[in-house]
């Protein structure tokens, strides 16, 4: 049986502090036997898509890059398969919300670029991200074929269907969304029931 850990933590604007907390939590999960660890969507920072601010493009980086190299080393050190979610700067003016899957040896097993990009109040992702261009292809890892998608992709069942038809054994959706403290209790309940 595969032991899986999911990490969804509160973040701050301090990227290094977020990474330190993640490292602690990932290490704890690995020490408790997790072979597959999945991080939340855009885990390096606060969820910045609540505003349209050009300064937030400074958070993006290439893959491979500083963050992916860090998580590669961590996956290798802990001997885990690690699913991350990074703000990818692919080229000038071309940015993606990208899941990067690291194998137990630290190599990049594969990436998935989020295809369905929301543009709703507090979710201004179309300002930041270009839809993915890699299709729906499972990523082969030592723990199985992972159908990695990102957040809002779950509202479109065809993505999950295509992953399953292509042989995905597990569907994974790093996600940042949820209710906010100013949502009514009935709205929070409605959102929990849709998951």
State what each model feature region is:
Residues 1-10:
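Short beta-strand segments enriched in small/hydrophobic residues
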Residues 4, 26-55, 75, 82-83, ...:
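Active-site beta-strand/loop signature of hydrolases that rely on acidic residues for catalysis
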Residues 9, 42, 87-89, 114-117, ...:
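Active-site beta-loop-alpha junctions enriched in small/polar residues
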Residues 14, 46, 92, 116-119, ...:
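Generic structural signal for helix capping and beta-alpha/helix-loop junctions
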Residues 17-28, 156-161:
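Short, acidic/polar
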Residues 20-21, 51-54, 97-98, 162-164, ...:
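Short, glycine/charged-enriched secondary-structure capping and boundary segments
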Residues 58-148:
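Catalytic-core segment of enzymes that process non-peptidic bonds
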Residues 60-83, 145, 151-195:
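CN hydrolase (nitrilase-like) catalytic-core segments centered on the catalytic cysteine
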């Amino acid at each position: 049986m595969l032991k899986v850990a999911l990490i969804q933590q509160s973040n701050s604007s301090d990227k290094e502090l977020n990474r330190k907390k993640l490292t602690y939590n990932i290490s704890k999960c690995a020490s408790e036997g997790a072979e597959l660890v999945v991080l939340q969507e855009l885990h390096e920072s606060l969820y910045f898509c609540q505003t349209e601010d050009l300064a937030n493009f400074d958070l993006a980086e290439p893959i491979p890059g500083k963050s992916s190299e860090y998580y590669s080393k961590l996956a290798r050190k802990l001997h885990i398969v690690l699913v991350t979610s990074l703000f990818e700067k692919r080229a000038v003016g071309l940015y993606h919300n990208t899941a990067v899957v690291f194998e137990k040896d630290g190599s990049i097993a594969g990436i998935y670029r989020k295809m369905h990009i929301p543009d709703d109040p507090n979710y201004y992702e179309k300002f930041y991200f270009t839809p993915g261009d890699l299709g729906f292809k499972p990523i082969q890892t030592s723990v199985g074929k992972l159908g990695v998608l990102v957040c809002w992709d779950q509202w479109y069942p065809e993505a999950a269907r295509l992953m399953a038809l292509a042989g995905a054994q597990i569907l994974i959706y790093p996600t940042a969304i949820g209710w906010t403290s100013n949502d009514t209790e009935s709205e929070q309940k409605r959102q929990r029931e849709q998951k």
